[in-house]
Amino acid sequence: MNIAVVGLSHKTAPVEVREKLSVPEDGLEGAIAQLCSYPHIEEVAILSTCNRLEIYIVTSETESGIREVTQFLSEWSHLPLRELRQHLFILLHQDAVMHLMRVAAGLDSLVIGEGQILSQVKNTHKLGQQYNGIGTILNRLFKQAITAGKRVRTETSIGTGAVSISSAAVELAQLKTPCLADCRVAVLGAGKMSRLVVQHLLAKGANQIAILNRSTERARELANQFSEASLQIHSLAELFNVITRYDLIFTGTSATEPLLDRSKLEPVLEVNQSLMIIDIAVPRNVHANVNELEQVQVFNVDDLKAVVAQNQESRRAMAMEAEALLEEELTAFDVWWRSLETVPTISSLRDKIETIREQELEKALSRLGSEFAEKHQEVIEALTRGIVNKILHDPMVQLRAQQDRETRRRAMQSLQMLFNLPVNDSVVNVNS
């Protein structure tokens, strides 16, 4: 078996490509089922955020497994393989393991050290288990990566003062407008990113804010979190009736098709109205053709890079400190991974010893007579199990702990010879 990740991110693909490959949460179950149906994919997990789409697999045949994932991505995005491949990255085993740990720690994010990605990795793990994509190996990998992400945040100061996508969007608005306090602002969506946008807008002095959402109840729940502010609530269905009231719009909904395009906006905008739209959704909530309207300025997540760059240099030293912690977690995972090679031999030895124990116990109980056997069977059973477990404990621990591959294999061969164990050809391949 081997671990691989196939994906793309803000580093390899622009937003117009990333949005085509985005897998919404309600599409995860079907996507995981489709990937698991391929003959060379044993386990799968899908990490889909506004800045990345990454598919982690355990595969019995690395080249074939990667080809199956690439084919899936082409079908999902309706992009030809030739176009898609130029944006993809592929990492194998230790590189794939370290990549997920760096992602969970926020070191691979557009905003170094941002905290939201760790909760997204946790959600990927939870849903991967729920939809039967994650098995023994990816379960261990994601747990180790989540531990790594937590350690980086608690043992370094990389997360202190880190900007997020939402705060960078507000920062961009502040750079582009004379005074946020004078702006009439609309926030489309009521999810976590929208909550952070509202939070940062209020911190920057904005005081004329409306929340528009399909569910006004959810919009009201969001507004209630900022009870000190007078936030207006509208249904998203009212958008084109009220849009002329606003100078600045933030969009962050989970809609899979654009909410705003030129044909919808042009008829409702007033002649002298200037409008700025900052779209932090992926897929984008704002169609590219809105840029054709002279009085409208549109920015998307890729336009935040310049804002974020100002925050990054001070974090690079912290990132180096974090990398050392990740190396420790990588080693811990690698020790576990390599110990999988010993599982068939250990299982065979346990099965053989257990068979002998049961046979000898049965003989002993029959000699002791039925009355004694019935009275003391549980005690004798526990005694023999305890003896067997204690005898096997040290050899098994030592075998698993052997990090040198050849030493470990020689030890397994010795056990197989000494105990006349079957040689198992299905030993897990732990080649890096």
UniProtKB/Swiss-Prot annotation:
Matches recorded under InterPro entries: 4pyrrol_synth_GluRdtase, 4pyrrol_synth_GluRdtase_dimer, 4pyrrol_synth_GluRdtase_N, GluRdtase_CS, GluRdtase_dimer_dom_sf, GluRdtase_N_sf, NAD(P)-bd_dom_sf, Shikm_DH/Glu-tRNA_Rdtase
Residues the record marks as active site: C50 (nucleophile)
Keyword S-adenosyl-L-methionine carried by entry: no
Residues reported to bind NADP(+): G189, A190, G191, K192, M193, S194
Catalytic activity from the UniProt record: (S)-4-amino-5-oxopentanoate + tRNA(Glu) + NADP(+) = L-glutamyl-tRNA(Glu) + NADPH + H(+)
Binding locations of substrate: T49, C50, N51, R52, S109, E114, G115, Q116, Q120
UniProt site (Important for activity): H99
GO biological process: chlorophyll biosynthetic process; protoporphyrinogen IX biosynthetic process
Keywords, alphabetical: Chlorophyll biosynthesis, NADP, Oxidoreductase, Porphyrin biosynthesis
Single GO molecular function: glutamyl-tRNA reductase activity
PROSITE patterns (UniProt xref): GLUTR
CDD domains for this protein: NAD_bind_Glutamyl_tRNA_reduct (cd05213)
EC id: 1.2.1.70
Superkingdom field: Bacteria
Pathway(s) served: Porphyrin-containing compound metabolism; protoporphyrin-IX biosynthesis; 5-aminolevulinate from L-glutamyl-tRNA(Glu): step 1/2; Porphyrin-containing compound metabolism; chlorophyll biosynthesis
Quaternary context: Homodimer.
Family of the protein in this entry: Belongs to the glutamyl-tRNA reductase family.
Role played: Catalyzes the NADPH-dependent reduction of glutamyl-tRNA(Glu) to glutamate 1-semialdehyde (GSA).
HAMAP family: Glu_tRNA_reductase
Domain notes for this protein: Possesses an unusual extended V-shaped dimeric structure with each monomer consisting of three distinct domains arranged along a curved 'spinal' alpha-helix. The N-terminal catalytic domain specifically recognizes the glutamate moiety of the substrate. The second domain is the NADPH-binding domain, and the third C-terminal domain is responsible for dimerization.
Note: During catalysis, the active site Cys acts as a nucleophile attacking the alpha-carbonyl group of tRNA-bound glutamate with the formation of a thioester intermediate between enzyme and glutamate, and the concomitant release of tRNA(Glu). The thioester intermediate is finally reduced by direct hydride transfer from NADPH, to form the product GSA.
Protein's name in the database: Glutamyl-tRNA reductase
